[in-house]
Amino acid sequence: MVRKTALGLCGMVLLAGGPALPAAFAQSSAGADVQTLDLPPSGFFTSLVLAQGYKESKDAFQTDRYKPVNPGITFKSDSEAIYLVFDILPRESPAHILGQLFLAKDAGRAEDRLLSEESVYLQTSQDSGFIEFLRPKEGWAPGEYKVKIHIGEKITDASQLGTLRFRIIASK
């Protein structure tokens, strides 16, 4: 009898929306989510790197595989493009992976500046891919850049998986 009453009370509390969370806890949870999105994504990707290029090969199932060429986090301003090269976990549905390239805020810029949005659509048989970020028309300005990585058909606050950062230095 006591057990049924306790279960009934727990069920009523849950149906009523549960106990209210303290405001401090709710704020710290929201801050943790923002901090997590500013880190490299984990879980969905088995490999994820920025590189100066990529090399294509076939695996045992004759599926295209992409391997990074000259991976790093620092690139020269005369680079034609920066590539986001990745492998993802097997899945039951196709994946639409999007990347937003930003020139990161600094002393001269109050906000990140969006430079481009690129995407790739992977069928269920594809576990490897890349996104190419071409040199902007005005060239790569030396400084910090970031790539926000999303999954889905369009970019929303909920679609972001994480962020990668890199630096452009002046060519000699």
Predicted features along the sequence, with ranges:
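Enrichment for repetitive, rod-forming helical segments
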Residues: 10-11, 147
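Contiguous segments within soluble domain cores/interaction surfaces
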Residues: 28-137, 141-142, 148-152, 156-165
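C-terminal segment of classical bacterial N-terminal signal peptides
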Residues: 15-23
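Extracellular interdomain linker/stem segments of modular secreted and single-pass surface proteins
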Residues: 168-172
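Short stretches within intrinsically disordered, low-complexity N-terminal or propeptide regions
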Residues: 8, 22-26
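Bacterial N-terminal signal peptides that target proteins for export
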Residues: 1-10, 18
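A generic local structural motif
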Residues: 11-12, 133
